[in-house]
Amino acid sequence: MPNLFSPFTLKGITLPNRIAMSPMTMYNSIDGKMDDYHVMYLGARAAGGFGLVFPEQVAITPEGRTTTTCAGIWNDDQIEGHARVTSIIKRMGGVPGIQLGHTGRKGSELPPHKGVNEQGSWKALAPDHPQGWTCVAPSAIPFGGDHSYPVHPLTRAEIKALHRSYADAARRAADAGYQWLEMHFAHGYLGASFWSPLANQRTDEYGGSFENRCRFPLEVAAAVAETIGADRRQFFLLNNSYPPLQKPRLNMF
């Protein structure tokens, strides 16, 4: 590990070292906004020496959150809080990164500090719960387990709208000062659901073959690149298999 503490440059962005703080949900946002808590916590991580600092997965739409206390960047009012976060990270010598995502059929949960289910995991909320909503997915197939409420299968028009939501979120992230962009297409969230032949049983151009199941993530990447510039590096968090509950592991490819 001789290079762990040496600088690293990619696409004109230089990290002071190779140590990154991964996105970790903090459940401390109101209306998706970053505030003093996030400035303090993330600034301290940069001051402690992390070269690349991510907040949590940041939702591109209100329904893309895990809980109502998760961060978002779906409207311009949220830019100011994110700008405060990127400013303190840079001041402390780090590079601010952002992970954009949509939880898909794994959203609408109760914040963990508010209670868990009998298995000790996060508790999914019914769509008619005051803090819940109807989750969306490629097909009308719930994730299962606690997430067994009906989900809404996305229409083509809604898929196109999500392309725009990702692109607009990326534009806001750039305006807020983030220098490193990652897209969360793993862990059973929306992007991963499109990859998965278990979750995605569509019969149109977004389902069926591997090429069709790749279409949504690739269209998102293209929309983002068109908005913020193809010269800006995008990174993707992917997984090639996912163990849905008690089912055997399934190769996505």
Model-derived segments and spans:
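Glycine-rich, proline-tolerant flexible connector loops at the mouths of alpha/beta enzymes
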Residues: 54-79, 100-120, 182-208, 242-245
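Conserved, mostly hydrophobic/aromatic
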Residues: 21, 45, 49, 89, ...
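N-terminal amphipathic alpha-helix/helix-capping segment at the start of soluble metabolic enzymes
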Residues: 1-20, 89
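Active-site mouth loops of central-metabolism enzymes
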Residues: 24-36, 69-74, 103-110, 145-165, ...
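Non-globular sequence segments
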Residues: 87, 95, 101-172
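Hydrophobic faces of well-ordered beta-strands that scaffold small-molecule active sites
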Residues: 19-22, 53-55, 96-100, 181-183, ...
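Alpha-helix-loop-beta-strand connector modules within alpha/beta enzyme cores
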Residues: 71-96, 198-232
